[in-house]
Regions:
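N-terminal cap/leader regions of alpha/beta-hydrolase-fold enzymes
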Residues: 1-256
């Protein structure tokens, strides 16, 4: 079990979360041939790669990227590539409570969302952005499916200094021992307690696992209903915790 404090110390200047009609602060560029959302101060020397959930670009996820970029006193350039190239999963498939929805979701995970399709692109994206944007240190965060990609991108030889997985999908104990960087996981009430426990028992690096048992799978990304005060509060808390963890393990003076 991790003994690290998960309470937020920074982020006192958190901008108000917009429940509806959010206007993203960033722009779109092309990186490794992929449309990529970019936000944050252009002179920031630290970068965060965001691996979205299977539903792609949603305002809740874009707002999260802006929060990561501008909320903390440690500034970041933040990048969210469109790994599904304009063809994400349809959010109407959730929950997969019919045979048709289940089949569509399963097919998506076997094809476009198959990790071997995405994983090789990540080092290329980081290298290209490091060269073009002068970024010296990197963190990675992923949501749902993106959490699996983050886990598999945090092994030996990783280009990242610290990682975060929010309401991660496909949590597997076998993935934990190979992680080589500090790692924060924020499971929702929909994740398997057994799977997360096996994963936590296997991880050998500094880590935090903080449950949000009253939140659904997706509360920090596309499925977040920010018009509900309880969800909005958990959304804010989750991003604050991630930023604190990143700062602790990536900021000036961090011991890695």
């Amino acid at each position: 079990m991790s003994t690290e404090s998960t309470q937020s110390k920074a982020c006192c200047n958190t901008p108000a979360v917009v429940a509806k009609g959010y206007q993203p602060k960033g722009d779109y560029i092309e990186v490794d041939g992929l449309k990529t959302y970019t936000t944050g101060p252009k002179d920031a020397k630290q970068g965060i790669l965001v691996v979205y959930d299977i539903f792609g670009y949603f305002n809740q996820t874009l707002q999260g990227a802006d929060i990561l970029a501008y909320t903390d006193d440690q500034k970041y350039q933040v990048f969210m590539p469109d790994f599904f190239e304009g063809e994400p999963a349809d959010i109407s498939w959730m929950p997969p409570d019919t045979k048709e929805k289940e089949q569509k979701m399963g097919e998506f995970f076997k094809t476009k969302a198959a990790p071997p399709k995405t994983l090789p692109r990540i080092p290329k994206i980081v290298d290209e952005l490091s060269q073009k944007n002068g970024i010296e240190k990197w963190a990675i965060i992923g949501f749902c499916w993106g959490g699996k990609i983050v886990n598999l991108s945090s092994m030996e030889g990783t280009k990242f200094k610290v990682a975060a997985a929010c309401h991660p999908a496909m949590v597997a104990g076998d993935d934990a021992p190979g992680i080589t960087i500090p790692y924060i996981m924020l499971p929702s009430g929909d994740e398997s307690k057994d799977d997360v426990k096996k994963w936590q028992d296997g991880i050998k690096v500094p880590h935090v696992v903080e449950w949000f048992p009253d939140q659904i799978h997706g509360w920090m990304a596309a499925r977040s209903d920010l018009e509900q005060e309880k969800v909005k509060s958990a959304y804010e808390k989750g991003y604050k915790m991630v930023l604190d963890f990143f700062k602790k393990h990536m900021g000036d003076g961090a011991k890695l």
